[in-house]
Amino acid sequence: MFSGIIQEVARVDLIHHLRDSMEIGVFARKLIDVVPGSSFSVDGICLTLVKRQYELLFFDVTEETMAWTTIKDYTVGTMVNLERSVRLGDEIGGHFVSGHVCGIGTIIAIEKSYMFFKAPANLVPYILEKGFIAIDGISLTIARVKGDIFSVSLIPETRARTSLGYKQVGAHVNMEPDMMTKMQVDTIMRFHAEKEISK
């Protein structure tokens, strides 16, 4: 479990493609007091640290994870958001983020204080004004929604301390809706579906 508060923006320094998986090495300056088995959010993707060589953190990526996330498009030099898993007693500064990416969205416009995204169809029911969403692992509040387009308000601190400061229009991002919102919407949809069946 994560909080959506990014602790470091790090650089992908190594990519090793295998037949049905891949290995990535991320150069981190701050989050190096870790051991194999530690859980990380890498751009919102829950990954397990396999090994550490000085400042280089190694993660294995499954075929399923590649299919559902932007990690398959990484190149050497890609900047990624890192967060260690929440531990007992840690402050939850954002919202609970599972690290299970549900879809890939696209940045369609960038303004001084706002960023606009196009959401994949499967996430549209869970994108509600003033609700939470994790974008590349960052806990953000949704400002406005129109169909599959929504905006978030960004303060300069968020741009400076996350990979969003490196993103351009057209970039793809990992999206995970707020789990509480998703559970409530799914429950309501299931209730109405069962009601229709019973008629």
Curated annotation (Swiss-Prot):
InterPro entries the UniProt entry points to: ATP_synth_asu-like_sf, Lumazine-bd, Lumazine-bd_dom, Riboflavin_synthase-like_b-brl
List of residues binding 2,4-dihydroxypteridine 1: G4, I5, I6, S139, L140, T141, S153, L154, I155, P156, E157, T158
Keyword Transferase: yes
Catalytic activity: 2 6,7-dimethyl-8-(1-D-ribityl)lumazine + H(+) = 5-amino-6-(D-ribitylamino)uracil + riboflavin
GO molecular function: riboflavin synthase activity
Lumazine-binding repeat intervals: 1-95, 96-188
Subunit: Homotrimer.
Name of the protein in question: Riboflavin synthase
Originating species: Chlamydia trachomatis serovar D (strain ATCC VR-885 / DSM 19411 / UW-3/Cx)
